[in-house]
Amino acid sequence: MKNPNVTILGATGAVGREMLKILEERSFPIGELRCLASARSVGKNLSFAGREIMVEEATDAAFTDADIVLGAAENDIARRFAPAIKATGAVFIDNSSAFRMDEDVPLVVPEINPEDALHHHGIIANPNCSTIITLVAVAALRRLSPITSMVAATYQAVSGAGAGGPVELEAEVDALYKGEPVQPHIFPYQIAYNLIPKIGSQSYEGYTSEEMKLQNEGRKILHLPEMKVSCTCVRVPVVRSHSIAVTARFERPISVEEARAAIAAAPGCQLVDDLPQDIYPMPLDTSDQDLVYVGRIRPDLTNPNGLCLWCCGDQIRKGAATNAVQIAELLL
């Protein structure tokens, strides 16, 4: 596919705007670029490569000449337009969760399973942001020994809830500073100076839908259908970049030295691990970056076959927009 026509569905949202930025940064070869959104955004201009692209309304006809469609819209919008996109012969790289677990839809992290993208039937799904960041960090270790299980706790930034998340955090901090009452709208409780241990809806055995994604999506991406994952997802008062504490268990023991070497050599990873010198991954450092930072690598004291680590990554870039553009690059 040479100089494909690219259409962004949901171009005015945070992920859609980041897709535009990343397409330009990576010099993605584009024939024609179209930006689609809802009717209320029609007529707005978005900047790309020194020019302005006018936003058009998303309709079935708007995909007629597309070769690649980058989806940055909600599930219902993705499902609404997927048939029209497929009918044109375009490839729909979708960031929503609408198709992730469909058997005939590849779920792809290019550093891990790029070959899966080549077996698509018109749709390729982008995994959940926390799934991408976690798996990029641990995938290098599976080359040393198969992963049998993982226990993870995510610390997810407020921007993961949309553009209103950082606005609400800032407003609450300002209100508290002035001694005024806090009125949450985006989150169920005050997020300023607080943690909220629920992201998503109630799902299975007391887990939330967000927590089950790491197991369900991880199994599919790693081709490990029996891998067991327990996850706790927490919203934290950080503006951007998610962090994950992971304990991974393997078929054989892996030394810390082996793990560090594997992660240092892994695509998409940056080893940041020198505890005595206070060097470790932090969300502030990974914001606006595409690499996943990995550190705090140490033995699991409860299981000789386990390793613990801490990873951070920008959930808007590598956790969403960059991963989608990388998938598109596989199709060129």
Predicted features along the sequence, with ranges:
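Charged docking surfaces used in two-component/phosphorelay signaling
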Residues: L9, V69, V158-L332
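N-terminal Rossmann-like NAD(P) cofactor-binding subdomain of oxidoreductases
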Residues: M1-I191, M227-K228, R252, V292-Y293, ...
